[in-house]
């Protein structure tokens, strides 16, 4: 009986240590994703500016119209990538917050 009483807290401590390590990994992953998202925001803004500039020149000739279409396609693709990254980041952070809450309830004592 004494062995069971001693083993339970030790197993719980190991579980909490694993949870803490997992939380740190997820936090690093979220930080990396957030940084990639910020970089992509700058790229989307630059692509949007390029498209606006090209669109203003559309009616000056066929080459300008092709350039406007090309820059619009690139801009739309970057916006889609940004939306995907933003969605992934929000999901990851929501999951991380839930995991932190569970960790705090189970492993953190006052």
Regions found by a protein language model. Give the residues of each.
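Alpha-helical interaction segments
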Residues: 41, 65, 92-94
């Amino acid at each position: 009986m004494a062995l069971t009483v001693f083993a339970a807290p030790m197993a719980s401590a190991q579980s909490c240590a694993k949870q803490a390590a997992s939380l740190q990994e997820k936090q690093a992953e979220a930080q990396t994703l957030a940084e990639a998202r910020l970089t992509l925001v700058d790229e989307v803004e630059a692509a949007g500016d390029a498209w606006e500039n090209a669109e203003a020149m559309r009616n000056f000739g066929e080459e300008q119209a092709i350039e406007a279409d090309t820059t619009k396609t690139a801009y739309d693709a970057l916006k889609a990538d940004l939306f995907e990254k933003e969605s992934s980041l929000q999901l990851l952070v929501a999951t991380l917050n839930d995991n932190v809450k569970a960790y705090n309830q189970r492993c953190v004592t006052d």
